[in-house]
A protein has these predicted regions:
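Basic, flexible Lys/Arg- and Gly-enriched helix-loop patches that mediate nucleic-acid binding at interfaces
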Residues: 1-240
Length: 240
């Protein structure tokens, strides 16, 4: 691996910043100052230090994002901003991608990583990873709807697995409901279509959880952070 790529991967700085830091003599390789960005290193064996601190290479990274509306859950899109546009240069340099998708008008929890094995495990239909959503609904959801969700709703192209519908609040004067829905699948517009089957309409949808991950309530829309060590350990254990 090139030295500059290693330094960027260790969050020392952007590619341009790293070159300047190398020129300034702030990086050593095996005890010797190194100024060549193109130097090939062995990230497992060589000791690389920045300002005297030993750097450790991170192969995989994991970010939690509170995805805002109006942004595409993809790595690139010709028309819209993507979730990668919300990251900084260092995070983007890790070549992360979103695990699954949230519709452009859906907001909430999104996991981004460069760990393909983890992503595959979380998205595998065999694992039935639960996802919980909070929805604002035009119309009054009822106990009958709760039972319909529990049986598995037959949509035009597939039958949903049994889902949990919780009635959070009902406002008969405004003819609206707030509900919490937990599903094991993640088909296109699934929650909206399930609610529409009950003759109501989702007007706002937020994802709260995915597997063991819970959206950090301190993250504002459009903000992101690394998973904590505890969050990552619990997540990895859940798919082991």
């Amino acid at each position: 691996m090139r030295l500059d790529k290693f330094l960027v991967a260790c969050a020392v700085g952007s590619r341009t910043e790293v070159k300047n830091l190398l020129k300034a003599g702030r990086v050593t390789v095996n005890g010797k100052k190194e100024k060549s960005a193109k130097l090939q290193i062995d990230e497992e064996r060589d000791e690389i230090r920045f300002d005297g601190q030993v750097l450790e290479y991170e192969e995989f990274v994991y970010y939690m994002m509170n995805k805002p509306q109006g942004v595409i859950s993809a790595t690139e899109d010709p028309k819209h901003r993507t979730v990668l546009d919300l990251l900084d240069d260092i995070a983007r340099s890790k070549e992360v991608f979103p695990v699954g998708r949230l519709d452009i008008d859906t907001h909430g929890l999104l996991l981004l990583t460069n760990d393909g094995q983890l992503a595959h495990a979380l998205l595998s239909p065999k694992r039935h990873v639960d996802k919980t959503y909070l929805a604002q609904v035009k119309g009054i959801m009822t106990q009958e709807d709760v039972e319909i969700f529990a049986k598995g709703i037959p949509l035009k192209d597939f039958t949903c697995q049994p889902a949990i519908l919780e009635l959070v609040s009902i406002d008969t004067e405004k003819n609206q409901s707030q509900i919490r829905v937990t599903i094991a699948e993640g088909k296109f517009h699934q929650v909206k279509r399930m609610v529409a089957y009950c003759s109501k309409e989702v007007v706002d949808l937020q994802r709260l959880t995915m597997g063991t991950l819970v959206l950090d309530e301190n993250l504002q829309r459009g903000e992101w952070r690394r998973l904590t060590k505890e969050e990552l350990e619990i997540l990895l254990a859940s798919i082991a």
